[in-house]
From Swiss-Prot:
The gene is slyX. This is Protein SlyX homolog. Belongs to the SlyX family. It comes from the Bacteria. Gene3D superfamilies: 1.20.5.300.
């Protein structure tokens, strides 16, 4: 009978471990989903900012250093 009890205990322990692994797997899956959503949002923002930079018009006004001084100097 001891062998049968040992086997039952081992089965119960294995079932407990499997249950905890299933919980851990689900938690990891949820974390992965959360991170993927955050990554998608960041990629969308980066594309938006890249398009904004491409669309920015270059100013026709030169900076002070690039301006030639007036003729009376």
């Amino acid at each position: 009978m001891t062998t049968e009890n040992d086997l039952l205990n081992r089965i119960a322990e294995l079932e407990t471990k499997v249950a905890f692994q299933e919980i851990t797997l689900e938690e990891l899956n949820q974390a992965l989903i959360h991170h993927q959503l955050a990554l998608d949002k960041l990629q969308t923002q980066m594309r938006h900012f890249a398009e904004k930079l491409k669309g920015a018009q270059v100013s026709n006004i030169a900076s002070q250093a690039e301006e030639t001084p007036p003729p009376h100097y």
